[in-house]
Each structure stands twice: as structure tokens, then as C-alpha cells.
Amino acid sequence: MAYPVIEAPYGLKPVNLIGGQVFAGSTRMYNIQYGYATDIFYGDFVVLSRGNVTRASVSTGTGLNQTVGIFLGCTFTSPVTKQKQFSQYWPASTTAGDCQAYVLDDPDTMFKAVVCSATTVVASAAMAMIGTNMSAINNTGSTATGNSANAVLAPTATAATTTLPLRLVGLVQESAISVSATGSSSSTTITLTGTGLPSAIPIGTDVAYIAANGQIIQTGSFVTAAAAAAATSVTINAAIAVPGSIVAIPSASTIVFTQYPEVLVKFNQALHGYYSATGA
């Protein structure tokens, strides 16, 4: 069975813990204040305000009120039916005084997330981004599904700043999509021959090529501008860097472009409130 095509972001989904720790999927329950007027979706960042959970818009990771974790649903007594209700999301302005949010608050959690170039436009991460810091995109989730639409921002260069909220730990191989074309590179430009790209590729697409012995060579470079199907020129973030002082893809090489729409990330230490000496 083929892995589903990734069509839109879904917030942060917990998958395991770093360092081989046992992941139980446990959550901590926090209060949501009566009438809180902002939707909170499954997979959203949340912070604490006077002991209550509120939705956080996290892009740079700066500020004193750091995240307490990721929202994973809630329970409350419906003001309409007077029955206990379990909900994928918190509906804004619900007049329930007993709401409890399920929050995954372990700062060592690794999450799966979708990479986007802007808002909800699915893009790609690349091998060169592993270990770097990533920004987040704040999107409004869906009241139909209850799921978040937050995403990881595809960079046009490897990030050097330490103020970004997420650290990219790995690429999700199962949803990767690869295409190939014949060509070469010079500095930050790949020139393709023949009919060019067989299909469009987004920002962040990983670049590799096939060696004479049939092995794949990772270049350490990635695409910085989306390229359409049949394009014969592709812009990359930097000249390739291959052992042996190789800085260009040889002429008539098979160049492999791999899109990784999903990544594994964790909170940067400065983002999570448990690692901060300043309380909420």
C-alpha cells in the first residue's frame, strides 16, 4: 500500500522520545478558562496564562512565556446538552467551566510535522537541514476535523540563528517523492538537458546525483525556488560540497531531486517552559 500523499499541514504529531527513551504517549491535564475566545486545535502549541492553557503562535521561539507543550484534545461539560464531551479541539468561547486540555508536555518528545513554503503550501526539507533550527508557520486549524494546520517553514538557507523554536532531527522517508533528470551544476545553478524536470519540485527539495559506479552522492544542497515541470534551470542554496573538493555536478549526470514533505522535530531548549528559569 502506498504512503498517503501529504496535501496539507496537520500541526505537530508526537511519535517518540529522543535518545531511545520509552514513549508512553502520556499527557498532562491543564485547565482551559471558561469562555476562552480562541480555538485550540489538535497539534497546536499552547502556553500557560494564570494557570490556564491558551493557544500560542510560535514562529521565532522568543519571549518569556514559553510553550508548555502540544494540545491533544480536551474534555468539558457541554453547556447545551449538559453531558460530558470529548473534543478534538477547543471551540472558541465555549461557556464550560470544567474544561481540561490534554497536553503532551514532555520536552524530549519528537514530533512529525509537514514542511511548507508559506501558509499551507507543502514544500520540502533536505538532508542538509538536519541538525539546524527551523521556524514554524502559524495557521488556523480546521473546525471540521479539529486538527491544527501549523507547519514547519522551509528555509531558503540553512539557519544560523538560535532563536528558532524547532530543531530538525530527521526526514520522514515514507512520504518522500523522488524524480530525476539529466544535467550538471555550476555554483548555485543546475542546468538540465532534454525535457528538463519530469514534474514540479518545491522549495527545500534535496539534491543528489548518481556516481559512475551507480552509487548516489549527497550534495549538501537543496532547491531554493520552486521549479515547474519541464524547467531546465534549478536554483540551489549553495554550490555542492562533495569529498575530493568536488563543487559541481559533472556534465550529463543523473540528478535526483527528492521532496521530503514531512520531518521529525523537537522543541529547542529555549522554547519549552520546563527548560526556562522564568515561570509562566
Model-identified regions with their sequence ranges:
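Surface-exposed, low-hydrophobicity beta-strand/loop segments enriched in small/polar/acidic residues
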Residues: 1-182, 206-221, 235-280
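Disulfide-braced loops of extracellular cysteine-rich modules
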Residues: 197-200
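Ser/Thr- and Asn-enriched, surface-exposed coil loops between beta-strands
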Residues: 182-195, 226-235
